[in-house]
Curated annotation (Swiss-Prot):
InterPro entries: PyrdxlP-dep_Trfase (IPR015424), PyrdxlP-dep_Trfase_major (IPR015421), PyrdxlP-dep_Trfase_small (IPR015422), Ser_HO-MeTrfase (IPR001085), Ser_HO-MeTrfase-like (IPR049943), Ser_HO-MeTrfase_PLP_BS (IPR019798), SHMT-like_dom (IPR039429). This is Serine hydroxymethyltransferase. Catalyzes the reversible interconversion of serine and glycine with tetrahydrofolate (THF) serving as the one-carbon carrier. This reaction serves as the major source of one-carbon groups required for the biosynthesis of purines, thymidylate, methionine, and other important biomolecules. Also exhibits THF-independent aldolase activity toward beta-hydroxyamino acids, producing glycine and aldehydes, via a retro-aldol mechanism. (6S)-5,6,7,8-tetrahydrofolate binds at residues 121, 125-127, 355-357. The gene is glyA. Coiled coil: none annotated. It comes from Shewanella loihica (strain ATCC BAA-1088 / PV-4). Homodimer.
């Protein structure tokens, strides 16, 4: 018999210590990685529930195993809430990740060798949008589009490439783009050549749910997202559509199961259901509004301090800091800030002369700092500390001073109070 008082601390002290140290790191470090966030204790409660024990291959009402009457309720709650949140008529909440959601879309809509128009990874796209090291770049003929000299998506180039190459699918969405995407313009281009429009909104899903960023669901044939990042739920993926095309919906479902996955993770789907309910609240909208305010405040402060922000600012939760003019590598900047308890990620910038393992930039995002309660004043103060470190990157005294300031600020704004 399994006893409820069983715990990790007594059974596996080594693992328990690692978990405790990570918990402390999250409380004592400022998190600026744009794709990271803090999920609620309610979501973690769902993920730690006995739902983890249940296999449920198939879909609600059409399972291959018995005993699914309760997990059917859980999955249907997640589906209906996702549809309400994004104005969709179809939702699949089973993908284990955003990348698996994306691979299901490829499988549902394309054949290997088909042409796909996707955003260049070096210009802000994602691995699954056609990078040669990813399945998408290996199995499909990828035509990349990018940004213009101002740092904005070049829709004229996109249209020219679409007309020239006639892709079967166009991809919108990004992992490092700070502007507003014109989903309607992309759909016009797709319709002009008879292509599917697939949007990966993983980075801005929370902003979209709160109405502070344009919703691609009314424009795209199919939309995918992660459920963490700005949405602040458990790590996982979803697929959405408002195309009112039952044949398309069947293809998407089949591409997830049995095409790409077996049993869904019912404890994670429960966490998704909780997160979607949280995202339907007025408090969530206020949070997302503050995310954008904080990101803009940070970008503006960097510019005032003489740093180069790609595209000159941000309209969402993230931006890229171009360090070429400062002659600092992203790798060195990442490491120096890490010693000051500020977590960022090195990132390639447009026309980056350095390798992806070194880079010339940083990607900075505001979702996590906003989640722990930072407002504009704290965002500006933090940005000035970052500038202090980067302006004198080898000065360990400055790094130590900033680290102490970070620890004081973190103590005032605990992640989990």
């Amino acid at each position: 018999m399994l006893k409820k008082e069983m715990n990790i601390a007594d059974f596996d002290p080594q693992l328990f210590q690692a978990i405790q140290e990570e918990t402390r790191r999250q409380e004592e470090h400022i998190e600026l990685i744009a794709s990271e966030n803090y999920t609620s204790p309610r979501v973690m409660e769902a993920q730690g529930s006995q739902l983890t024990n249940k296999y449920a291959e198939g879909y609600p009402g059409k399972r291959y195993y018995g005993g699914c009457e309760h997990v059917d309720i859980v999955e249907n709650l997640a589906i209906e809430r996702a549809k309400e949140l994004f104005g969709a008529t179809y939702a699949n909440v089973q993908p284990h990740s955003g990348s698996q959601a994306n691979s299901a879309v490829y499988m549902a809509l394309l054949q290997p060798g088909d042409t796909v128009l996707g955003m260049n990874l070096a210009h802000g796209g994602h691995l699954t949008h056609g990078s040669p090291v990813n399945f998408s770049g290996k199995l499909y003929n990828i035509v990349p589009y990018g940004i213009d000299e101002s740092g904005k998506i070049d829709y004229d180039e996109m249209e020219r490439l679409a007309v020239e190459h006639k892709p079967k699918m166009m991809i919108g969405g990004f992992s490092a783009y700070s502007g507003i995407v014109d989903w309607a313009r992309m759909r016009e281009i797709a319709d002009k050549i008879g292509a599917y429009l697939f949007v990966d909104m993983a980075h801005v899903a929370g902003l979209i749910a709160a109405g502070v960023y344009p919703n691609p669901v009314p424009h795209a044939h199919v939309v995918t997202s992660t459920t963490h990042k700005t949405l602040a739920g458990p790590r996982g993926g979803i697929i959405l559509s408002a195309a009112n095309d039952e044949d398309l919906y069947k293809k998407l479902n089949s591409a997830v199961f049995p095409g790409g996955q077996g049993g869904p993770l019912m404890h994670v789907i429960a966490g998704k259901a909780v997160a979607f309910k949280e995202a339907l609240s007025p408090e969530f909208k206020e949070y997302q509004q503050q995310v954008v305010v904080n990101a803009k405040a940070m970008a503006n402060t960097f510019i005032e301090r003489g740093f180069d922000v790609v595209s000159g600012g941000t309209e969402n939760h993230l931006f890229l800091l171009d360090l070429i003019a400062k002659d600092i590598t992203g790798k060195d900047a990442d490491a120096a800030l890490g010693r000051a308890n500020i977590t960022v990620n090195k990132n390639s910038v447009p026309n980056d002369p350095r390798s992806p393992f070194v880079t010339s930039g940083l990607r900075i995002g505001s979702p996590a700092i906003t989640r722990r309660g930072f407002k504009e004043a704290e965002a500006v103060e933090l940005t000035n500390w970052i500038c202090d470190v980067l302006d004198d990157i080898n000065n360990e005294a400055t790094i130590e001073r900033v680290k102490n300031q970070v620890l004081e600020l973190c103590a005032k704004f605990p992640v989990y109070g």
